[in-house]
């Protein structure tokens, strides 16, 4: 998230583990390590993941995969529900251009995921391994190759999803992209599917991006999630990072229970459920499908009671 600045900051391990144990006792179901930076850069990430799992919390990662080396994978796979690698290209050259990194990192990622898949099979672990790719004009032709590589190295799936942009983002390169012309790509990618490998082409999300229309009028999803940034701040929404009214508190300064049950959290959720203008939110946000479902529950349409 470029608008937050790429700051070399890390959550304190002891504090984070304490908060994870609190979250487990409170009934938090899952945690995904991802966000403004690369989660595997944290030197204690294996211990943190193990702590979350032992607290009864399901663990997942979204990562670029460059640091998912064999020794780290051996610790993570046994306590993790799924690991998803963000890879927006099918060749080293396009990977280097799109990710703004060395071309060698592409093969490093592929090797790391292959080792992880082999480890999973050898140890009979249950961790799901997959790739996700943002569909861009620059990577369209390389996606069949990416699907093939992912399948052959032992991944379970490849997700192809639309570009989305937080309104605060400093970059606007793809704001005018339209996905209607890429619909036939789904059929090409389906050729790579097998019994144990799926290509998930997010047609619905692409249509919603093209139409820029929302099927709900308020945000009802906030009681079901929070985002904790690397500065330990607890936020209600990606769209409003940096806005004080959406900052519930800081886990360095208060327990998660005190923050979650605090007045700032309650008042913000009430505002979002009753007043917020979702037309100012970004299309295909993480909470979009949850909001569509919850809005329909609150505002049923004709014949919804029939199976």
Identify what each model region corresponds to:
Residues 42, 68-70, 140-143:
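Short, well-ordered alpha-helical microsegments
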Residues 213, 240-288:
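Membrane-interface junctions of multi-pass transporters
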Residues 2-14, 21, 25, 55-60, ...:
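Radical SAM enzyme [4Fe-4S]-AdoMet core and its adjacent flexible, acidic
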Residues 32-37, 64:
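Glycine-rich beta-strand-to-loop/alpha-helix junction loops that act as flexible
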Residues 43-58:
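Aromatic-lined substrate-binding rim segments of carbohydrate-active enzymes
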Residues 291-307:
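Terminal, non-catalytic domain-edge segments
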Residues 16, 20, 31-32:
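Active-site-adjacent substrate/metal-binding segments within catalytic domains
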